[in-house]
C-alpha cells in the first residue's frame, strides 16, 4: 500500500505520488493541505501512451515515482519496468486550481537504469538514476537532459556507488546550505533497507558520505514494529520545516517467515538540520513521533482538514470517487 513515496509542495498544497506496479490507473496521486489527511486523486497514467502495462507481470510495471514542480508545471518521472523505459509525464493545474491536467504524450529518456529523479537548476534539467556500470556494479548516475525532448546533453556520469550496501538506488538530489545532497537507498527493499546520504560542492560531485551513515534504518533493531525503512524523499512545509517521507513495513513473522499484510507503507518524519547534515526524528524510525520534541513542525500540522467520506457498492458503471 503506497510504496516509494515522493512529495512536492505547491503553495499551501502537498502532492504525493506512489508506485502502482502492474495496475491501472498507474502512478497513485494524493493531495493534502495539512500533511496528515490525504485525498486520493485520479491516477496519473491512464492510457497506453502514458504507460503500456499490458505485458507487466506481478511487481513489474510502474515503480519508483518522483514528483517535482517547476515554472508552472508538474513533472512526474518514473520507470515502467514492463517496457524498461524511463519517462516524464507533465501536468498543470486547471483554471480554478482544483485538478491537475496530465498530458498524454510522455517524454522518454534514453537511460539504462531505474528509479529516476528530477532536479531543476538555472533553467537546466538533471536526471539521477540507478543502473549498472562496467563490471556489473550498481551506481547512482546522472545525466543532463533537454526537458522538452528528453534528449541527453551530458552523461551518464557516476555520482556514487553508495556505502557498500547492496542495491544502491532511489536517488534524490537537493540543495541546502550552498551544497548538494544526494539521498539514496541501500540494502534492498527487505530487512537490510536503509537511507544514506552524500554531500558534494558540485552537482556532478564528488560526493562524500555522511559520517553517520546509514542516516535512517531499523536494520539492526529487529524489535522495532517498523522495518524495511528506505526509499526516501525530502521536502519543506509551508513554514520552512524539513520533512522526510519514506517507505516502511509493519511485518509479522509466521513460521519464521516475515509477512507484511499491508505491504510497503508511506511514512512521514520531521527533519532537523545540524550544521552540515540532516537528523531525521532524532535518528530513530519510530512507529509514533512525539511532536512535543518538534514544536516548529507541529505548527504546520495545527489545522487539520476534514475529508469527505464515500461508500461504493460497485453496482454502477462509475466508481466513487471519480
Regions found by a protein language model. Give the residues of each.
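Carbohydrate-active catalytic/glycan-binding domains of CAZyme proteins
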Residues: 1-322
Amino acid at each position: 500500500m503506497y510504496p516509494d513515496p515522493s512529495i512536492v509542495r505547491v503553495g499551501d498544497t502537498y502532492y504525493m505520488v506512489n508506485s502502482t506496479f502492474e495496475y491501472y490507473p498507474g502512478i497513485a496521486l494524493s493531495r493534502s493541505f495539512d500533511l496528515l489527511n490525504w485525498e486520493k486523486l485520479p491516477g496519473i497514467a491512464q492510457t497506453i501512451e502514458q504507460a503500456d502495462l499490458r505485458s507487466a507481470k506481478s511487481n513489474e510495471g510502474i515503480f519508483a515515482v518522483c514528483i517535482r514542480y517547476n515554472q508552472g508545471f508538474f513533472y512526474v518521472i518514473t520507470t515502467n519496468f514492463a517496457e524498461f523505459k524511463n519517462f516524464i509525464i507533465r501536468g498543470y493545474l486547471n483554471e480554478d486550481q482544483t485538478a491537475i491536467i496530465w498530458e498524454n504524450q510522455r517524454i522518454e529518456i534514453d537511460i539504462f537504469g531505474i528509479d529516476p529523479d528530477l532536479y531543476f537548476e538555472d533553467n537546466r534539467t538533471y536526471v539521477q538514476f540507478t543502473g549498472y556500470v562496467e563490471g556489473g556494479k550498481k551506481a547512482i548516475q546522472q545525466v543532463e537532459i533537454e526537458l522538452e525532448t528528453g534528449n541527453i546533453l551530458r552523461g551518464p556520469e557516476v555520482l556514487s556507488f553508495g556505502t557498500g550496501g547492496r542495491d544502491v538506488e532511489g536517488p534524490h538530489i537537493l540543495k541546502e546550505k550552498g551544497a548538494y545532497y544526494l539521498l539514496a537507498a541501500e540494502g534492498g527493499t527487505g530487512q537490510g533497507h536503509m537511507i544514506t546520504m552524500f554531500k558534494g560542492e558540485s552537482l556532478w560531485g564528488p560526493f562524500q558520505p555522511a559520517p553517520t551513515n546509514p542516516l535512517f534504518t531499523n536494520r539492526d533493531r529487529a524489535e522495532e514494529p517498523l522495518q524495511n525503512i528506505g526509499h526516501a524523499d525530502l521536502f519543506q512545509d509551508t513554514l520552512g520545516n524539513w520533512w522526510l517521507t519514506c517507505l516502511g513495513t509493519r511485518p509479522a513473522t509466521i513460521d519464521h517467515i516475515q509477512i507484511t499484510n499491508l505491504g510497503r507503507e508511506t511514512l512521514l518524519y520531521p527533519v532537523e538540520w545540524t550544521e552540515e547534515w540532516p537528523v531525521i526524528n532524532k535518528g530513530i524510525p519510530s512507529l509514533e513521533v512525539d511532536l512535543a520534541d518538534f514544536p516548529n513542525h507541529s505548527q504546520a500540522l495545527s489545522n487539520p482538514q476534514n475529508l469527505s467520506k464515500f461508500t461504493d457498492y460497485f453496482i454502477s458503471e462509475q466508481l466513487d470517487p471519480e
